[in-house]
């Protein structure tokens, strides 16, 4: 059984998948906050081969390692010049966040041969571009939806903290809705700009805030759950599957 782990800045997402299973055909899937991580020990016990993407630092890596089955074959996923049909065009390939690299691999596996814009919407929002020939050419990083909303509350005297999960009208007639409309537009703009800049690109949106941000997009797109885990699965197996946005 293969265990795939996506350790992000706020949560750790994971999936178990049988050898030979189709791309993204999980046997089990879950998530936990960093504080709750110990609860996954029993779930992870069946993972004999493990692939981990970790962007949350060495302390969390040590906690993850301590929870894995003794004797498990563990690979700490890293950005490399090439993997799973994707060529890493970052100026220094090793400096590309491993989660972004995995997400691009996942998108490429789902939509082979297509130009791609891959948006992952979590604590931060990343918007990355992959050419049809499989070259990752770079991207954008911006504060995530909730972080944008909370920064206004922290740094202005009279603006309230708002829930970034509520869908507002375009023109808010109260301060909360005006903030939410503003931050949604600020999230959608870079994605739409990337699609326009790449030209006729397939757009894949993933992450916890993806359903809210997708509602504001004016370009064709598809929301794909757990694109980093899909990418880890593709990186480990070479599997592809086709989807259309």
Summary of predicted features, one role per range:
Residues 1-23, 107, 111-136, 152, ...:
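Gly/Thr-rich phosphate-binding beta-strand-loop-beta motif of the actin/hexokinase/Hsp70
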Residues 1-83:
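N-terminal glycine/serine-rich phosphate-binding loop of ATP-dependent small-molecule kinases
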Residues 11, 53-62, 181, 200-217:
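Glycine-rich phosphate-binding loops at beta-strand->alpha-helix junctions
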Residues 65-69, 84-86, 212-219:
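Short loop/helix-cap segments at secondary-structure boundaries that form the rim of catalytic
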Residues 68-74, 91-93, 218-226:
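Active-site regions of enzymes building and remodeling cell-envelope glycoconjugates
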Residues 76-118, 124-127, 171-172:
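Active-site neighborhood for divalent-cation/phosphate handling
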Residues 142-198:
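Active-site rim beta-loop-alpha module in soluble metabolic enzymes
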Residues 221-245:
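Glycine-rich phosphate-binding/hydrolytic loop that grips phosphoryl groups
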